[in-house]
Regions:
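A small/polar active-site loop signature that marks catalytic segments
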Residues: 1-4, 8-155
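Small-residue-rich helix-loop
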Residues: 84-236
Length: 236
């Protein structure tokens, strides 16, 4: 998407890019020009791709913790999708992976480990931006509980979650509450839905897992106020 601003009417909004590849190449060429690197008249074009002719020019590797931290702290959808496809590659290592492989991996874990019927839920991407994802608070809570009881999962997950009033997508929330510096949770929002899920320590020192999903939300700000109040109560 590209942000659009109209000075005359003081309007700011977002529009979808019709062809993202054209936008990418146009922006890429513009950045090259800014660095003094110019190209000819015919700057770029599409060409047919033969599968056997695909070659890897370079590989960039990053520790999974770095990708996880950016996916959670900054709510980076690209990092979330990358982890989704990485999971898919582990689940189906012998062919070119697709989103269905990632969905199958999640469904298998959901059924064999958590004991939930995958037919009752629907997951179509790794970032959660699709309106065709359907899960329940109870299912998400079971994932959080499973992570807590497996320290090799919990420790990097806990460190990567935004901290209320401190950083990430929760940097400006719950600042004047008991939840500040205590709640570690992931935010989520699509049209009409706002969510918050993670961990909070109660006054007795016990670690609590919680999931809040508000549906049919007209104003996301109101849902966030509600979520923040719940977190404040859980912290007391």
């Amino acid at each position: 998407r590209q942000r659009q601003m109209c000075i005359r009417d003081s309007y700011t909004g977002q529009v979808n890019i019709y062809t993202s590849k054209d936008f990418f190449f146009h922006t890429f060429i513009q950045r090259l020009k800014e660095k003094g690197i110019t190209s000819g008249v015919h700057t770029y074009a599409d060409c047919p791709v033969i599968h056997d002719s695909i070659a890897t020019f370079c590989t960039i590797r990053r520790p999974i913790r770095q990708v996880l931290e950016r996916a959670l702290k900054k709510s980076d959808n690209l990092c979330a999708e990358s982890m989704f496809y990485h999971l898919a590659a582990q689940h189906a290592p012998h062919h070119r992976v697709t989103a269905d492989d990632g969905t199958d991996a999640i469904a298998d874990f959901m059924k064999t480990v958590l004991g939930f019927n995958p037919d009752n839920y629907k997951i179509v991407d790794g970032s959660g931006v699709s309106l065709y994802n359907y899960i329940s608070p109870r299912l998400l809570l079971e994932y959080l509980k499973y992570a807590y009881y497996h320290r090799d999962i919990f420790l990097p997950l806990y460190d990567a979650l935004p901290i209320a009033g401190v950083d990430g997508t929760l940097q400006y929330r719950m600042k004047q509450t008991k939840a500040r510096g205590n709640v570690r949770a992931k935010t989520g929002s699509v049209t009409g839905v706002s969510s918050l899920a993670g961990y909070v320590k109660g006054a007795d020192g016990h670690q609590l897992a919680f999931v809040i999903i508000n549906q049919n939300v007209l104003k996301l700000s109101r849902a966030r106020v509600f979520q923040d109040k719940v977190c404040d109560i859980l912290s007391r």
